[in-house]
Amino acid sequence: TVHARKAWLQGLSPKENRDIPPLDYDLVLRMKDRFPNLHLSINGGITTLDQAQGFLDRGIDGVMIGRAAYHDPASVLSRADPEIYGQGTAADPDNVVTAMRPYIAAHLEQGGKLHQISRHMLGLFTGRPGARIWRRHLSEGAPRPGAGLEVIDAAQTARTEAEATTAETL
C-alpha cells in the first residue's frame, strides 16, 4: 500500500500531516506504470467510490478509503460491493444494526463495554433523518455502567421516530 501523502516527521502534528503535505497520486500511478507486476494499493485522501473506481480503472490494484468510510459507512462501505464489483445490493444501516446485535451481545457477555463497539456505529446514519439523535443516544447511553442492547434499541427507536417525523413534514 502506497500512501499518496508524504508525512513530514518534524514540524507537523499528526492532524496537520493529514492535511498539509500535498497528495501525489501521480507518483503512485507512475510507480504502477514502472512496476506493473507489483500489487499496488493507493491510500490517502480518497473519500468517494467514484474516486476509488477511477484509480482501479487506471490500473491500481486496490484502494483504501479510511476516514470517509468510517464516518459515513452508508455512503461508502454499504455501496462498495454493488458499485465497484457489481455484486450484491447496498447494505441498509438498519439491517447492519440488526446484524450487529449478536456480536454486541457476545462482547458484553465476555465483559466488554457497549461503548467499545457503539463508538464505531456512530456514523451509520450520517446524512439521514434522525442521525443526530442516534449519535446522541449512543454517545450518552453507551458509556454508562451496565449499558447493554437496550441503549441500541432506544437509539434505534428514537432515530426511527425522528425519521418518521421528518417524512411527515415533507
PLM features: what roles do these ranges have?
Residues 19, 23-170:
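Alpha/beta catalytic cores of nucleotide-metabolism and tRNA/nucleoside-modifying enzymes
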